[in-house]
């Protein structure tokens, strides 16, 4: 009986060891989907790549991950079609300390989110409105979004070992709305560009020329939109001497061109490009109003992928979606199993048949003694 108890304990140890053995973070892994197939596809569609740090590391305690995450991302992809350097950073929920904010800014980031409290020390803060997780989406909040606002929607594909499903009802609602699908960086850059139109003086009284002035404070070049009005409709509108393309009224992704409407036109142009309004009469009055939202749409929407350690998993449900994403990339941890586990496994592998043989021999000996 005693020997059977020993054997039982040995078998229990074999079962429990994989569960109780600790794991040790030895190195950091790479997500090669950032540069292979998926990353380039998402970049071409207009998505943005930002940073979230390193998996399992609190950026508020380990400031080194801010710059290291930027460098990790730069090894694999550009941040956007509008600029190579990442400018969006995912900060843990709650207040931001001045030290953390300064480190984020010095690393080249200018936007943080998305549940920030208090002062951001010069960084642009984006606040989360709701989640895209199935059963968690606030449909009323999506329906009641303010005009010209940026609606930021949280998305995570996996929580530990649990796969998260998207809310298809929320996605259907977004597709039906009069909204611009964009990203954090694109939205802020577009807004700043729209506020930077300047009237360029020329020696032609039948023409008015405007241009977005480029800023030295940003590493991105994002087109901006303004609504132009005039006392007389122009004969033609040109970009750098070429007829400006027409943007359809239902266009929900950023393009350059014009969208004529009654009384004026929405003009979206890249920084540095001249916009020429050609009139039949001389000295026509032209005014412009900056637009936060592209193409005269009601408001803007960006879905934000948080803690993205595997781009394949995070994008798998959105291959043909019109939604645009801000992917906050997190360098994944590479887990190394405790060295004691394989050593113990080998020992058990050797000891188990010996123990079984010994138990059988002991039982046979006991049986012989009983019959005698």
Language-model-detected regions and their locations in the chain:
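C-terminal beta-sandwich/jelly-roll accessory domains of carbohydrate-active enzymes
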Residues: 208-360
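Extracellular beta-rich ligand/substrate-recognition surface
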Residues: 131-132, 217
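C-terminal domain-boundary segment and adjacent tail
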Residues: 36-37, 111-112, 157-251
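Metal-dependent polysaccharide deacetylase catalytic core of the NodB/CE4 family, i.e.
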Residues: 24-130, 148-153
């Amino acid at each position: 009986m005693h020997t059977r108890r020993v054997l039982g304990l040995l078998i229990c140890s074999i079962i429990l060891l994989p569960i109780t053995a600790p794991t040790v973070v030895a190195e950091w892994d790479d997500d090669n989907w950032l540069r292979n197939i998926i990353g380039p596809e998402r970049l071409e569609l207009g998505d943005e790549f930002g940073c979230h740090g390193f998996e399992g590391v609190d950026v508020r305690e380990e400031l080194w991950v801010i710059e290291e995450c930027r460098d990790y991302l730069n090894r694999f992809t550009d941040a956007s079609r509008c600029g190579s350097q990442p400018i969006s950073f995912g900060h843990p929920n709650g207040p931001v300390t001045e030290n953390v904010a300064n480190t984020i800014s010095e690393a080249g980031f200018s936007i943080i989110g998305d549940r920030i409290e208090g002062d951001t020390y010069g960084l642009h803060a984006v606040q989360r409105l709701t989640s895209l997780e199935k059963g968690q989406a606030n449909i009323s909040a999506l329906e009641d979004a303010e005009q010209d606002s940026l609606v930021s929607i949280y998305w995570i594909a996996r929580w530990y070992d649990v796969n998260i499903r998207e809310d298809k009802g929320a996605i259907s609602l977004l597709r039906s709305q009069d909204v611009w699908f964009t990203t954090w960086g694109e939205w802020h850059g577009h807004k700043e560009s729209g506020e930077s139109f300047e009237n360029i003086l020329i020696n032609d009284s039948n023409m008015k020329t405007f241009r977005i002035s480029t800023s030295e404070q940003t590493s991105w070049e994002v087109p901006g939109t303004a609504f132009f009005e005039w006392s007389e409709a122009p004969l033609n509108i040109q970009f750098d001497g070429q007829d400006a393309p027409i943007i359809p009224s239902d266009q929900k992704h950023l393009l350059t061109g014009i969208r004529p409407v009654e009384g004026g036109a929405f003009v979206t142009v890249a920084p540095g490009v001249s916009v020429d309004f050609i009139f039949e009469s001389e000295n026509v009055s032209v005014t412009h109003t900056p637009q936060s939202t592209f193409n005269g749409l009601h408001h803007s929407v960006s879905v934000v992928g948080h803690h993205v350690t595997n781009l394949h998993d995070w994008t798998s449900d959105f291959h043909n979606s019109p939604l645009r994403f801000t992917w906050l990339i997190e360098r994944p941890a590479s887990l190394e199993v405790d060295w004691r586990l394989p050593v113990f496994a080998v020992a058990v592998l050797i000891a188990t048949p010996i123990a079984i043989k010994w138990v059988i021999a002991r039982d046979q000996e006991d049986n012989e003694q009983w019959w005698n």
